[in-house]
Swiss-Prot record:
Protein name per the record: Nucleoside diphosphate kinase
Binding partners and assembly: Homotetramer.
SMART domains, per database record: NDK (SM00562)
Gene of this entry: ndk
Active site: H115 (pros-phosphohistidine intermediate)
Entry keywords, A to Z: ATP-binding, Cytoplasm, Kinase, Magnesium, Metal-binding, Nucleotide metabolism, Nucleotide-binding, Phosphoprotein, Transferase
Organism: Staphylococcus carnosus (strain TM300)
Keyword Cell membrane: no
Cofactor(s) this protein cannot do without: Mg(2+)
Length: 150
């Protein structure tokens, strides 16, 4: 089963949206296999957003993500990267479709509530950056037989 990394950003935590976002993911049939509140170190933020280091918004992004706690999580499901990207919506909440997390809850590009891995490769890299293997659970949910075709 595929896994992806999601992070509810400081704006989402401060606005008390963690429960709503997890509920949306679980209603979609996705399984939470790891999660933790944490204050992000500057080093971890710089590593996570390293691909943007040469962009003008990089310093502000690092500063924002380290400014208050985030909720980092790993979610599992069939085609979970694609499914969660569709659920999250476009980066700019004003362009995100109604019904998506950013379309419904995001305010601006800089306060768009959530990060999600954009590929299976990114998900693997980000999961290993944010979680130790022993922090992730392996279990069969009671409803899995109803969610996936064999």
């Amino acid at each position: 089963m595929e896994r992806t990394f999601l992070m509810i950003k400081p704006d989402g935590v401060q606005r008390k949206l963690v429960g709503e976002i997890i509920t949306r993911l679980e209603k979609k049939g996705l399984k939470l296999v790891g999660g933790k509140f944490m204050t992000v170190s500057k080093e971890k933020a710089e590593t996570h957003y390293g691909e943007h280091a040469d962009k003008p918004f990089y310093e502000g992004l690092v500063s924002f993500i380290t400014s208050a706690p985030v909720f980092a999580m790993v979610v599992e499901g069939e085609n979970v990267v694609e499914v969660t990207r569709n659920m999250i919506g476009k980066t700019n909440p004003t362009e995100a479709a109604p019904g998506t997390i950013r379309g419904d809850l995001g305010l601006t590009v800089g306060r768009n509530v959530i990060h999600g891995s954009d590929s299976v490769e990114s998900a693997k890299r980000e999961i290993s950056l944010w979680f130790e293997p022993n922090e992730l659970s392996v279990y069969t949910a009671n409803d899995e037989e109803w969610l996936y075709e064999n």
